[in-house]
Amino acid sequence: MAADPDCIFCKIVAGEVPCFKLFEDAETLAFMDINPVHDGHALIIPKAHFPTVFDIAPEAIAAAARTTRRIAQAVNAALKPDGLNLVQSNGPGAAQSVGHFHFHVLPRWNGDGLLVNWTPKPGDHAHIGEIAERIRQHL
């Protein structure tokens, strides 16, 4: 997909907006989030513009996943967090802040107060089965 002239991430890829670059290859760019949740909060993007997971080409998401793994390993080695979250949001209902597919690498420390956890509760198996069937119809 071509670059979007209004996309901040496309402007970063083009060198029009500076970033704290961590890694770059032919298909992806990894850089520090300038509004970090914690030290080490990094973003990984495909260089091509894809708004969401629903739009991204299979080869582009594979490249982004490879780079995400590499950055996660480096963050883990450099900062030694207690854990690490990978976050990828799609659309306003999921709080996607930039309309360019991206992964967040979020190092976590015990007691850091970041709330991305939910409490598992037993689901209704009949309902879960119905939802599974609805999803399978689209595969």
Predicted regions and their residues:
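HIT superfamily nucleotide-processing domains
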Residues: M1-L139
